[in-house]
C-alpha cells in the first residue's frame, strides 16, 4: 500500500509576531486555538503563501469581507510581514519518503503600493535532523539571531553534501516540482489552474457553500476529457485540413490551368526577353567584332585609297605638268605649222620676187652692157684725155729736167751739183733729212727692197691692166653678179669674193644636192628620236609603275619573267576562280546545311529536353532508341509490381484503419451492437467497467475474462430473459454477467495465475487456460497503446501507400511521357547534335569566309599583279622593239648634226636656188673681175702711181745709188759754181707743151659730151638698179623674215609640222583624257575617301557605341546572370530553341505573353506592380525579378503537404500526379475521419454515464457525512433537457439533418451548432460563432447540470443552498464537497504522476467555532477515512479530542509584540504531552 505524502511542519520566519516559529503539523487535524488577533489567520496565510505564491491570487481578508470584491490595499499580506527578509516554508515527506522543503522568501517593497516581493524555492535531500529554522537563521548570541538572505541560504545549502537548492523564476515551475514530488494533487499548468486551486483553498478556509462553488463544481469535479475533446479537435482539424487540402486541391485543379498559363506566359515573357537579350548580346558582340573588322578594313581601304590618291595626285600633277608642256609643244607645233605655212607663203613671195629680180637682172644686164659700152667709150675718151694730160705732164717734166753740161768742169760742177742735188733729192725723195753720203749705202738696201716690191706691184698692175683691157666689157656683168650674190662690195673685192662665191657655190650645190637625203635622214632620225623619247617615257612610266629602275639590258629578261608571271598568274587566277567557285559552292552547301540544321535544331532540342526530363525522372542515361524501348518494358514491369505492392499496402492500411476504428469505439466495444444491447438491457459493458485498468494489468484481465471480455454486466439476469427472445441483431456469442456495475469485481471466477497465463475454473468440470495476449486490448490504456502503435503503423503504411501511389502515378506519367516521347521525338532524339554540327559548320564557315577573304585578297593581289604584269608586258612590248633606240645615246646628237647639216644644206639649197643662175653666169666670166673696168683709170692711176712709186722707189734707190755712186762727187764742190744753164731746150719743150695742152682740151670736151650720154645711160641703169635693189631689198626682207621665221619651207615641212601637231594634239588629248580620268578617279577617290572617312567615323562611333553598349550590357547581363543563377531559374529561362528565333519573333512572343500576363495578374497587386516595373526595356533584370516573383507566388500557392518541391514547374508536373491520388485518398480519409452523429451522441452519452458513475462512486464516500440536521450529502448530475434533445436527435433522427453534416462548407462543430440552433430557436446565442458553440457542445460537461443535495431532517433530499442551511451545516457541506474535489483531482492526475506517489491532502478551516462538536468530530472522521490533513482555526473554548492543538497568545514585551505558542497533542484524560519546542521563549530579531 502506497503511503500518502504528509506535510510535516510549517515554518514562519520574521512574520508579524513570529520571528522563527515552526508548527509541526498533525497527520490528521492541526488546530490553531487562540483569541482574536492571536495569529491564527497569519499562520494559515503563511501556509497558503508557501503553497500558492501568486500575488495576483493571494487576498487575505477577514470573514467580514467575505463578500467584498476588494480587501485592504495590500490584500492582507504586506501587513503580516516584518521589515527585512521573511520566509514561509513547508516541510513535507512524500510517498517515496523523500523530505522536501518548499517555501518562499518574502520581503516588503518600500513604497505607497505596499508591495511584497516573493521568491519561491525548494530544498531536496535535507537530512531529517536539520530543522528549517536552522537553515534560514544564524545565531549571533544566546538571545539574538539573524535571518539569512536567500543568496546566503543558497550558499549554505550548496555547502551541504547531498542537498539540492532550487530557486524558481516562475510559479509554474514551482508547482510542477510540487506536483511531481506529490505535494499538490493537481498539475497547475496555467494561471487558471492556480486560480481554481486557490479558490478551493479559499473556499475551505472560509467555509460554507455558495452558488459560485456549485456552478464551478463542473470545472472541479468533471475532468475535461481532453482526449475526447482533443480527438474531436484533431478530427475536426484533420477534417478541416482535409477539406482545406481538398479545397486547395480543387483550387489547385482549377488554378492548374492558371498556373500553367501563368508560368507558361511568364516563361515565354521572360525567356523570350532573356534569350532576345542573349541573342542581342551575341549579335552585339558579333556586330562589335564586325564593326572592328570593318573598321580595320576601312582603315586599310582608307590607307590604300590615300596611297592611291597620293599616286594619282602625283600622276595628275605629272600629267598637269606634262599637259602644260604638251600644250606648249602643241602650241609651238601649231605655231610652227603656222610659221611653216607662213614660210611657205613667204617662200612663194620670195619665188615671185626672185622671178621679178631675174627679169630685172636681165634688163639690168642689158642696160649694163649699154652702159659698159658707153663707159668704154668714156674710158677711151678718158684715156685720150689722160694721155693728153700725161703728155702735158711729160713735157712739163722733160722741160724741167732737161740740162746738160758739156765739159769736165762743168761735168764735175754738174756732178757736184748733181751729187748735192742728188743728196737733196735723195733727202727729199727719201724723206731723210738726216741723210748723208755716208748713210746712203745703208738706206740704199732698204729702198732697193722697196723698189723691188714696187716693181712687183707695178708688174701686177700691169698684168691687171692688160687683163682689164681684154675683159673690160664683161667686168660690170661679173661685178653685178657678184654684187647680186654677195651684196654691195668694193669693186676691188669682187674678184676675191667671186672666187669665194664660186667655191662656195660648188659647195652649196653639193650641199643642196644633199637636202632631200638629209631631210629624209632627218625625218627618219627625228622619228627615231621621237620613238626614243616615247620609249624613254614608256620606260620611265614602266619603271615608275614597277617602282623600280631597270637597265635596258634587264628588260628582255624582265619581259620573259613577266611573261612567265603572267602565265603563272593566269593559271593561278584560273585555278583561283575554280577554287573560289569550289569555296563558294562549299560555303553555299554549308549555309544550306546550317539552315537545315537550324530548322532541325529546335525539334532536336525539344526532343533532348524531353529526353533529359525522362532521364532526370528515371535516373537513366539513354544512348539509343533501343534503350528507350527496353526501359519502357522495364517501366511497365515496375508499374505492375508497384501496383501490386500498393494494393497490398492499401489492404493492410484499410485493415489497420478498421482495427483503429474498432478500438476507438467508446467503452472498448468492438461491435456497435453491444452498445445498443447494453443500453437496451440497462447494463454496462464489461470493457467499460474495466476501462481504467492500467496497461500492466490489461494482459491479466484480458486473459482472465477471455472471450467474455466483451460481456454485458447487468444488475439482474432474470430481467434480460425477455429481451433475448427473438434477438437477432447481436454477435454470435453474447456474454451476460450479473453484477452491480458500480461495485463490480472479478470474484465471479476462480482463477489460478500462472507464468504469463491464467487458468480460469468456470465450473468443476470446465477450465479455461488463457495466456496473456502479446497485444492486450482490454482497458482504455491498452487500447490507446494499441491504437498508438496502430497509428504509427498506419502512418508508415500511409506514407508507404502514398509513396507507392505516387510512384505508380509517377510511373504511369513516366510511361505516358515515354509514349509521347516515342511518338514525337524518338525519330530525332538520338541523332547527332545539330548545334555541335552547327558550331563546327560555323567554324568551317568562318574558316571558309576567312579563306575566301584571303583568297579574294590573294586573288585581288594576283589580279593586280596580273594586270601589272600585263601592263608591264604591254609596256615592254612597246619598249622592247625600241631597245636599240634606247641604247642609241648618240641619236639626239646625230639628229642635231643632221639638222645642222640639213640647215646648211637648206641654206645651200636656198643659196643655190637664189644665186645658182648668177653663179652659173659668173663662173665663165669670173676672171674679168680681176680688173675692174670702172677702176681702169684708177688702175692706170694705180699703175701710174705704181710706176711712180716704182719710179720714186727707183728714183729713191737711184738717188741713193746716185748718192752712193756720187760719194766721190761730193768732193767737187768747187766745180758747182761754175755751172750755168742753157735755156734753148726749154723753149722747144714749151712749144710741145702748148700743143699737148690744146690736145688735152679737145679730149676733155669730148669726154664731157660722152659723159653726159653716159649719165643718161647711168640714170636708166640707176632706175633699173633702184627697182632691182627695191625688189632685192624686199626679197632680202622676205628672206630675213623667212630666216626670222626659222623654219624650213620645203615641200614636206608643212606635212611634217601638221603630223607633229597632230601627234602632239593626240598626246595632249590622251594626256587630257588621262588627266580627266585621273581627275575623275581622283574625285571618285576623294569621294571614296570622304565616304570612307565618314564611314570610318560612323564605324568608329558605331563601334565605340556598340562596345560601350556591349560593356554596359555586360554589366547588366552579369547582374541578370547573377540573379538568374542565385534564384536557380537559368534552366527555365535559357531555352536554347528560342535562340533560333529572330528578335522580332521573340519580341512579339514577349509582347503577346505580356498581354496575357496583364490579364493573368490583374487581381494580384504585387505581381501587377512587379510586371509593370518589368516592362522597362532598359532594366532587363526586372523581368527576372518578375519571374522570380511569379515563382515565389506560385511557391506560396503550392501546399508543401501536397507538392514537395519548390519549383513551380516541377510542382505543376507533380500536381497532376498528386491531385487525383490526393483527391481520392483525402476523400476516403474524410469518410474515415468524419465521425457519424450517432457515434458522437454515443461518445458523449458514454462519457456522461462514466462521469455519472464516477460521481456516484464519489457520493458513496459522502453517505456517512452528517452535519447538524444534515444526514447525508450528495452530488446530483443531470443532463440538460435541451442537450438531451440534441443527443436524441443525433442518435435517432440524424438522417433528417444530413444537410448539415454532409456539407463540405461546415465543420462538424459548426454543423452541431447549427443543429442546436435549429432545435432550440428560442435560445439566444449572442455573439458567439457556430464554431465556438459547436466546440462547447462537443464538451460533455456542458451537457450536465451538477447540484449539491443534502438529506436534511424530515425534508429529505434538498438542494444545498446557504439560505436553507445553518452556518455549520454549510461549512460541513462545503468541506465535504471540497474533499470530493480533491479526491477527483487525484483520480484525474493519477496517470500524469508517478504510480508510486500518493499526493498530500490538506484543507483549511478558519473560524471553526461555527461548527458544533459533532460536526468537528465528523470532520475528524472524514480526515481519517480520506487520509487528509486539516488545519483548523478555532476559538479558545474548542478542545478537540484528537490531533494537535496549538494555543496562540499574542503578548507585548518591552514594546515588542510576539505570539506565545503552546502545542498540545490529543486532548484526553491523560496528561498532555508537551510537543518539542513548545516552551520556546519569545525571541526577537537582532
UniProtKB/Swiss-Prot annotation:
Where is coiled-coil annotated?
Answer: 326-418, 444-480, 509-603, 835-923, 977-1115, 1209-1266
Any one Pfam family here would be SbcC_Walker_B
Task: Give yes or no: UniProt keyword DNA-binding.
Answer: yes
What superkingdom heads the lineage?
Bacteria
Q: Which residues bind ATP?
A: 34-41
* Localization per record: Cytoplasm, Nucleoid
- What InterPro entries is this protein classified in? MukB (IPR012090), MukB/SMC (IPR050308), MukB_hinge (IPR032520), MukB_hinge_sf (IPR042501), MukB_N_dom (IPR007406), P-loop_NTPase (IPR027417)
Q: Which keywords fit this entry according to its UniProt record?
A: ATP-binding, Cell cycle, Cell division, Chromosome partition, Coiled coil, Cytoplasm, DNA condensation, DNA-binding, Nucleotide-binding
- Keyword match DNA-binding: yes
Q: What is its main location?
A: cytoplasm
Region entry Flexible hinge, spans = 666-783
A cellular-component GO term for this protein: cytoplasm
Q: What GO biological process terms does the UniProt entry carry, in alphabetical order?
A: cell division; chromosome condensation; chromosome segregation; DNA replication
Q: Name one GO molecular function term.
A: ATP binding
Quote the HAMAP family the UniProt record gives: MukB
The annotated subunit structure for this chain is: Homodimerization via its hinge domain. Binds to DNA via its C-terminal region. Interacts, and probably forms a ternary complex, with MukE and MukF via its C-terminal region. The complex formation is stimulated by calcium or magnesium. Interacts with tubulin-related protein FtsZ.
Description of its domains: The hinge domain, which separates the large intramolecular coiled coil regions, allows the homodimerization, forming a V-shaped homodimer.
Q: Which family does it belong to?
A: Belongs to the SMC family. MukB subfamily.
Q: What does the UniProt function comment say about this protein?
A: Plays a central role in chromosome condensation, segregation and cell cycle progression. Functions as a homodimer, which is essential for chromosome partition. Involved in negative DNA supercoiling in vivo, and by this means organize and compact chromosomes. May achieve or facilitate chromosome segregation by condensation DNA from both sides of a centrally located replisome during cell division.
Please identify the protein, giving its name as recorded. Answer: Chromosome partition protein MukB
Amino acid at each position: 500500500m502506497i503511503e500518502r505524502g504528509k506535510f510535516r511542519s510549517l515554518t514562519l520566519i520574521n512574520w508579524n509576531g513570529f520571528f522563527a516559529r515552526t508548527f509541526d503539523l498533525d497527520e490528521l487535524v492541526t488546530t490553531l486555538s487562540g483569541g482574536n488577533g492571536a495569529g491564527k489567520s497569519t499562520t494559515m496565510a503563511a501556509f497558503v503563501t508557501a503553497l500558492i505564491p501568486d500575488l495576483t491570487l493571494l487576498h487575505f481578508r477577514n470573514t467580514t469581507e467575505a463578500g467584498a470584491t476588494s480587501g485592504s490595499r495590500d490584500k492582507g499580506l504586506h501587513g503580516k510581514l516584518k521589515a527585512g527578509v521573511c520566509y514561509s516554508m513547508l516541510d513535507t515527506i512524500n510517498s517515496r519518503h523523500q523530505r522536501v522543503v518548499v517555501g518562499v522568501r518574502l520581503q516588503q517593497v518600500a513604497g505607497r503600493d505596499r508591495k511584497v516581493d516573493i521568491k519561491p524555492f525548494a530544498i531536496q535531500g535535507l537530512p531529517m535532523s536539520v530543522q528549517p529554522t536552522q537553515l534560514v537563521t544564524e545565531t549571533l548570541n544566546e538571545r539574538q539571531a539573524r535571518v539569512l538572505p536567500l543568496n546566503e541560504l543558497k550558499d549554505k545549502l550548496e555547502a551541504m553534501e547531498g542537498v539540492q537548492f532550487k530557486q524558481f523564476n516562475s510559479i509554474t515551475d514551482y508547482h510542477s516540482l510540487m506536483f511531481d514530488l506529490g505535494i499538490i494533487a493537481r498539475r497547475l499548468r496555467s494561471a487558471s489552474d492556480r486560480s481554481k486551486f486557490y479558490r478551493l483553498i479559499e473556499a475551505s478556509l472560509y467555509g460554507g457553500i455558495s452558488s459560485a462553488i456549485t456552478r464551478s463544481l463542473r470545472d472541479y469535479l468533471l475532468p475535461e476529457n481532453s482526449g475526447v475533446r482533443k480527438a474531436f479537435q484533431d478530427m475536426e482539424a484533420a477534417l478541416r485540413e482535409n477539406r482545406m487540402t481538398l479545397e486547395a486541391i480543387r483550387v489547385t485543379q482549377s488554378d492548374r490551368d492558371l498556373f500553367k498559363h501563368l508560368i507558361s506566359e511568364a516563361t515565354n515573357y521572360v525567356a523570350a526577353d532573356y534569350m532576345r537579350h542573349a541573342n542581342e548580346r551575341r549579335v552585339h558582340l558579333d556586330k562589335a567584332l564586325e564593326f572592328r573588322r570593318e573598321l580595320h578594313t576601312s582603315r586599310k581601304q582608307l590607307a590604300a585609297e590615300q596611297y592611291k590618291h597620293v599616286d594619282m595626285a602625283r600622276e595628275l600633277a605629272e600629267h598637269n605638268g606634262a599637259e602644260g608642256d604638251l600644250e606648249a609643244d602643241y602650241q609651238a607645233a601649231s605655231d610652227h605649222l603656222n610659221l611653216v605655212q607662213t614660210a611657205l607663203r613667204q617662200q612663194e613671195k620670195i619665188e615671185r620676187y626672185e622671178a621679178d629680180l631675174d627679169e630685172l637682172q636681165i634688163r639690168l644686164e642689158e642696160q649694163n652692157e649699154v652702159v659698159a659700152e658707153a663707159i668704154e667709150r668714156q674710158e677711151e675718151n678718158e684715156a685720150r684725155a689722160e694721155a693728153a694730160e700725161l703728155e702735158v705732164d711729160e713735157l712739163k717734166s722733160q722741160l724741167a729736167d732737161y740740162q746738160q753740161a758739156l765739159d769736165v768742169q762743168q761735168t764735175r760742177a754738174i756732178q757736184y751739183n748733181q751729187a748735192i742735188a742728188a743728196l737733196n733729192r735723195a733727202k727729199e725723195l727719201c724723206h731723210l733729212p738726216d741723210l748723208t753720203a755716208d748713210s746712203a749705202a745703208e738706206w740704199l738696201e732698204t729702198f732697193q727692197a722697196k723698189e723691188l716690191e714696187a716693181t712687183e706691184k707695178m708688174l701686177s698692175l700691169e698684168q691687171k691692166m692688160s687683163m682689164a683691157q681684154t675683159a673690160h666689157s664683161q667686168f660690170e656683168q661679173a661685178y653685178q653678179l657678184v654684187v647680186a650674190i654677195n651684196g654691195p662690195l668694193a669693186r676691188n673685192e669682187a674678184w676675191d669674193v667671186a672666187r669665194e662665191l664660186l667655191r662656195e657655190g660648188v659647195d652649196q650645190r653639193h650641199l643642196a644636192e644633199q637636202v632631200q637625203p638629209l631631210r629624209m635622214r632627218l625625218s627618219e632620225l627625228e622619228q627615231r628620236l621621237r620613238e626614243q623619247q616615247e620609249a624613254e617615257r614608256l620606260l620611265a612610266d614602266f619603271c615608275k609603275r614597277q617602282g623600280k629602275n631597270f637597265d635596258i639590258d634587264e628588260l628582255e629578261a624582265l619581259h620573259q619573267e613577266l611573261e612567265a608571271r603572267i602565265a603563272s598568274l593566269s593559271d593561278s587566277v584560273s585555278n583561283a576562280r575554280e577554287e573560289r567557285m569550289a569555296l563558294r559552292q562549299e560555303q553555299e552547301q554549308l549555309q544550306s546545311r546550317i539552315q537545315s540544321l537550324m530548322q532541325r535544331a529546335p525539334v532536336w532540342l525539344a526532343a533532348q529536353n524531353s529526353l533529359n526530363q525522362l532521364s532526370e525522372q528515371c535516373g537513366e542515361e539513354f544512348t539509343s532508341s533501343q534503350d528507350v524501348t527496353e526501359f519502357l518494358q522495364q517501366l511497365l514491369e515496375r508499374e505492375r509490381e508497384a501496383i501490386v505492392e500498393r494494393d497490398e499496402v492499401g489492404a493492410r492500411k484499410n485493415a489497420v484503419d478498421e482495427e483503429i476504428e474498432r478500438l476507438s469505439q467508446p467503452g472498448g466495444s468492438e461491435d456497435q451492437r453491444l452498445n445498443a444491447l447494453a443500453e437496451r438491457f440497462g447494463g454496462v459493458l464489461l470493457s467499460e467497467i474495466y476501462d481504467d485498468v492500467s496497461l500492466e494489468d490489461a494482459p491479466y484481465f484480458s486473459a482472465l475474462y477471455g472471450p467474455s471480455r466483451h460481456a454485458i454486466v447487468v444488475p439482474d439476469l432474470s430481467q434480460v430473459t425477455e429481451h433475448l427472445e427473438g434477438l437477432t441483431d447481436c454477435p454470435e456469442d453474447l456474454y451476460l454477467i450479473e453484477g452491480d456495475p458500480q461495485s463490480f469485481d472479478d470474484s465471479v471466477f476462480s482463477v489460478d495465475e500462472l507464468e504469463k497465463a491464467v487458468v480460469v475454473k468456470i465450473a468443476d468440470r470446465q477450465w479455461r487456460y488463457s495466456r496473456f495476449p502479446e497485444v492486450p486490448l482490454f482497458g482504455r490504456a491498452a487500447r490507446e497503446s494499441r491504437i498508438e502503435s496502430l497509428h504509427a503503423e498506419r502512418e508508415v503504411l500511409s506514407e508507404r501507400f502514398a509513396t507507392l501511389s505516387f510512384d505508380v502515378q509517377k510511373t504511369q506519367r513516366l510511361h505516358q511521357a515515354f509514349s509521347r516521347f516515342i511518338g514525337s521525338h524518338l525519330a530525332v532524339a538520338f541523332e547527332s547534335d545539330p548545334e555541335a554540327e552547327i558550331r563546327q559548320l560555323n567554324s568551317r564557315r568562318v574558316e571558309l569566309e576567312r579563306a575566301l577573304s584571303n583568297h579574294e585578297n590573294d586573288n585581288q593581289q594576283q589580279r593586280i599583279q596580273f594586270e601589272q604584269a600585263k601592263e608591264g608586258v604591254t609596256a615592254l612590248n612597246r619598249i622592247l622593239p625600241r631597245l636599240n633606240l634606247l641604247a642609241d645615246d648618240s641619236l639626239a646628237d646625230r639628229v642635231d648634226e643632221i639638222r645642222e647639216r640639213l640647215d646648211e644644206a637648206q641654206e645651200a639649197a636656198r643659196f643655190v636656188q637664189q644665186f645658182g643662175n648668177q653663179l652659173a653666169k659668173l663662173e665663165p666670166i669670173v676672171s674679168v673681175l680681176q680688173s675692174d673696168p670702172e677702176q681702169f683709170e684708177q688702175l692706170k692711176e694705180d699703175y701710174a702711181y705704181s710706176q711712180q712709186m716704182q719710179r720714186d722707189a727707183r728714183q729713191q734707190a737711184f738717188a741713193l745709188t746716185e748718192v752712193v755712186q756720187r760719194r766721190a762727187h761730193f768732193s767737187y764742190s768747187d766745180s758747182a759754181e761754175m755751172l750755168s744753164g742753157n735755156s734753148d731746150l726749154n723753149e722747144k719743150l714749151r712749144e710741145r707743151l702748148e700743143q699737148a695742152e690744146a690736145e688735152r682740151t679737145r679730149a676733155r670736151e669730148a669726154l664731157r659730151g660722152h659723159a653726159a650720154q653716159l649719165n643718161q645711160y647711168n640714170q636708166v641703169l640707176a632706175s633699173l638698179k633702184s627697182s632691182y635693189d627695191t625688189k632685192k631689198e624686199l626679197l632680202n626682207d622676205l628672206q630675213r623674215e623667212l630666216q626670222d621665221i626659222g623654219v624650213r619651207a620645203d615641200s614636206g615641212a608643212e606635212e611634217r609640222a601638221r603630223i607633229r601637231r597632230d601627234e602632239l594634239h593626240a598626246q595632249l588629248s590622251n594626256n587630257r583624257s588621262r588627266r580627266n580620268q585621273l581627275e575623275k578617279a581622283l574625285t571618285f577617290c576623294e569621294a571614296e575617301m570622304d565616304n570612307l572617312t565618314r564611314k570610318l567615323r560612323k564605324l568608329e562611333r558605331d563601334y565605340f557605341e556598340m562596345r560601350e553598349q556591349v560593356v554596359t550590357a555586360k554589366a547588366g547581363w552579369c547582374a541578370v546572370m547573377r540573379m538568374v543563377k542565385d534564384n536557380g531559374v537559368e534552366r527555365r529561362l535559357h531555352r536554347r530553341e528560342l535562340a533560333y528565333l529572330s528578335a522580332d519573333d521573340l519580341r512579339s512572343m514577349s509582347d503577346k505573353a505580356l498581354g496575357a500576363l496583364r490579364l493573368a495578374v490583374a487581381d494580384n497587386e504585387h505581381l501587377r506592380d512587379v510586371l509593370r516595373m518589368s516592362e522597362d526595356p532598359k532594366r532587363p533584370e526586372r523581368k527576372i525579378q518578375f519571374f522570380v516573383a511569379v515563382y515565389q507566388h506560385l511557391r506560396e500557392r503550392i501546399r508543401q503537404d501536397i507538392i514537395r518541391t519548390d519549383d513551380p514547374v516541377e510542382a505543376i508536373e507533380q500536381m497532376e500526379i498528386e491531385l487525383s491520388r490526393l483527391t481520392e485518398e483525402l476523400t476516403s480519409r474524410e469518410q474515415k475521419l468524419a465521425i457519424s452523429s450517432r457515434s458522437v451522441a454515443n461518445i458523449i452519452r458514454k462519457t456522461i454515464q462514466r462521469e455519472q458513475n464516477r460521481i456516484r462512486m464519489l457520493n458513496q464516500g459522502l453517505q456517512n457525512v452528517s452535519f447538524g440536521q444534515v444526514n447525508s450529502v450528495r452530488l446530483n448530475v443531470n443532463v440538460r433537457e435541451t442537450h438531451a434533445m440534441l443527443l436524441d436527435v443525433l442518435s435517432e433522427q440524424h438522417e433528417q439533418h444530413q444537410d448539415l453534416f454532409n456539407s463540405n462548407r461546415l465543420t462538424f462543430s459548426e454543423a452541431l451548432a447549427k443543429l442546436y440552433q435549429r432545435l432550440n430557436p428560442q435560445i439566444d446565442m449572442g455573439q458567439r460563432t457556430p464554431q465556438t458553440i459547436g466546440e462547447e457542445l462537443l464538451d460533455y460537461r456542458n451537457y450536465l447540470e451538477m447540484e449539491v443535495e443534502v438529506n436534511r431532517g424530515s425534508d429529505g433530499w434538498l438542494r444545498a443552498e446557504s439560505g436553507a442551511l445553518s452556518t455549520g451545516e454549510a461549512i460541513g457541506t462545503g468541506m465535504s464537497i471540497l474533499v470530493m474535489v480533491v479526491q477527483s483531482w487525484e483520480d484525474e492526475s493519477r496517470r500524469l504522476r508517478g504510480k508510486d506517489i500518493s499526493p498530500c491532502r490538506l484543507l483549511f478551516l478558519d473560524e471553526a467555532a461555527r461548527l458544533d462538536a459533532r460536526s468537528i468530530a465528523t470532520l475528524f472522521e472524514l480526515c481519517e477515512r480520506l487520509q487528509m490533513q486539516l488545519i483548523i482555526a478555532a476559538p479558545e473554548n474548542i478542545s478537540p479530542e484528537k490531533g494537535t492543538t496549538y494555543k496562540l497568545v499574542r503578548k507585548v514585551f518591552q514594546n515588542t509584540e510576539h505570539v506565545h505558542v503552546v502545542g498540545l497533542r490529543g486532548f484526553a484524560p491523560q496528561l498532555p504531552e508537551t510537543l518539542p519546542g513548545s516552551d520556546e521563549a519569545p525571541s526577537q530579531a537582532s
